[in-house]
Structures are given as structure tokens and as C-alpha cells.
Amino acid sequence: MPPPNSAPPAQVVFVTGPSGAGRSTVINALEDLGFEAIDNLPLSLLPRLLEGAPPDRPLALCIDPRTRDFDARDLIHAYEKLEQDPAYTADLVFIDCEPATLQRRYSETRRRHPLAPDADPADGIAIEREMLAPLRTRADVLIDTTPLTVHRTRDEVIRLFALDRAPAMSIQIMSFSYRRALPISADLVFDCRFLRNPHWAPELRAKDGRQSDVQAYVAQDARFEAFRTQINAMLDLLLPAFKEEGKSHLTVAFGCTGGRHRSVTLAELTARRLAEEGWQVSKRHRDVDKDASENSDRDRGASARTAASTDDGEAEQP
């Protein structure tokens, strides 16, 4: 037993099982729960990985039977050695699936089995099951994915390893300029270009939607409150649903012409509200500084053109 005042034991979870059963789904779910995940770790590197002080974060180690030095007995030995170390708690998780379902999955994806690339997938499945049999017998946790979808597999991992905590879904609130195209990472996009534009108020043009007077100007649009209310209602519906489905990251983007005033205003207000409700929120104003520099360049160019036109005796059109 560790001394009473020492740090709690570091958690290490070994994940293994046949190809196609869902190892990657499980290791990704553990990573979303806060584990430091290492995929396809060769067993020969395990001692070096665990040298020194125990890690601060729990470890999830995916052991692939296709790796060159794989041996079920060596993995069991490494696991049992770690299990006896008071500085660690260890779990051996076996991801299983019925051979017929594995064969169907290979057929649907038209992939070859890695252990029998030139033969029927059934041959590779049989070879792998024999290799892994001792691990299946020794496992602390067995997850049979035969009847499970990807989402239900994730839910099972969460149930087993989150200690009744749902995984945090990180939400990024972004503002952007339509002149620079839609952000490809956005899951939800709201177009703010119909709202009144502070760009045309000289005292606000150089400011942005992070400032209260710009926000107040945008909020004076008669449609603003209804627009914001509808957005809030939609997010109240969708965010819990996305979280329930196992989504770990969500990007909500607000766009306007320059990405400086209206989109930033809505992004700021939405991020503040979600944070107050307990969501894990980050903000990114993608184009706000670019818009400022471009406006400055345009103003200098306009001044130069005005001066040139005045010299020629012509007035420049606004």
C-alpha cells in the first residue's frame, strides 16, 4: 500500500483484441475521457515508457497483435508486473467480436485481413483469435462489440471508465469573415450579415464586437433579439444531443462580411452564455485582426486616390 499522503496510483489501461472489433473506437473514447492514449505500442517499448515517475494522466495503451514483437504471454507478464506495483492500477481490456460479424465487417469495407492479406478474411480471423485466446481469458474487462454500434461502444467505455462522469464536450465559438470563406471545421454556421453594421458608424469602425459599444449598436437592430433567442434555443436542443451521441468537439461559427463587428458580437455573447451554463467553451475570432489591417490599407489607398483625383480636378465617387 502507498503511504497515506502519497499521490494516488497512476491508472494504466491495456486495450487489445482482434482487428475489426473496435480497438480504435475504444482508444479514442478513452482519449476523450482524458487518458493519454498511445496506439499500436510495441511491447518492447513498454518498459521504457513506464520508467521513472508514474505519469500524471491515466494511460491507455492499445496493443495491436499485428506488431512484430507481439506475444500474448509477454503482454500478460507486463500487465501482471504493473498490477503488483503499488504506484499503478492496471486494467486489461479485451475488445471482442463474433467471427461472423468480423467477417461481415471486412466484406462491407472490402479490406483484407492484416494477418492473411492473400487469403479469405476468415483465415486471418481464426489465426488472430488463437493468438489472442490467453488475453481474452485473462482480461479484467471484456467488451463484445458484436451487437454494438460505434456510439454504443463509446457509451460502454464511458460507463466503465468515466466513474459516472460524462465526457466533457469542448465547444469552440468562432467568428469569421465571409470574404475569407467558411471555416471548414465548423459544425454549425450562423450568418449575421443581415444585422446593422457598425462598419458604417465612423466612431465604431476601428473597434470590434468584443467591445460593449459595438455590441450595443448591433443589438439595436430590431431583429437582433429574435435572432439571438432562436440561436440559444437551437443550441439548448442540439448541444445535449451531440454530447449524448459521443461528440467530443463542436465548432459553432458566426459569420459577417468583415468578421469584425456583427459576427464577433454574437460569438462573444454566445460563448459567455454557454460558459455560464457550465459548458467547456473556447473562443476564436479568426479574421478580426485581418479585417483591421485591410481596412487600414483601404483607407490609405482611398486617401491616396482622393489626393490624386483632386490634383486632376476630379472628385472621387464615394
From Swiss-Prot:
| Keyword vocabulary terms for this entry | ATP-binding, GTP-binding, Nucleotide-binding
Segments carrying the region annotation (Disordered) are 278-318
Q: Which Gene3D superfamilies match?
A: P-loop containing nucleotide triphosphate hydrolases
Q: Which Pfam families match?
A: PapZ_C (PF22740), RapZ-like_N (PF03668)
Q: Which residues form a coiled coil?
A: none
In this chain, composition skew of type Basic and acidic residues spans 286-302
The UniProt entry, under InterPro entries, shows: P-loop_NTPase, RapZ-like, RapZ-like_N, RapZ_C
Q: Where does ATP bind?
A: G17, P18, S19, G20, A21, G22, R23, S24
* Binding locations of GTP: D64, P65, R66, T67
Q: What does this protein do?
A: Displays ATPase and GTPase activities.
The family note in this entry says:
Belongs to the RapZ-like family.
Listed HAMAP family? RapZ_like
NCBIfam families registered for this protein in UniProt:
PRK05416.1 (NF003828)
Please give the name of this protein: Nucleotide-binding protein Jann_0539
Which organism's genome codes for this protein? Jannaschia sp. (strain CCS1)
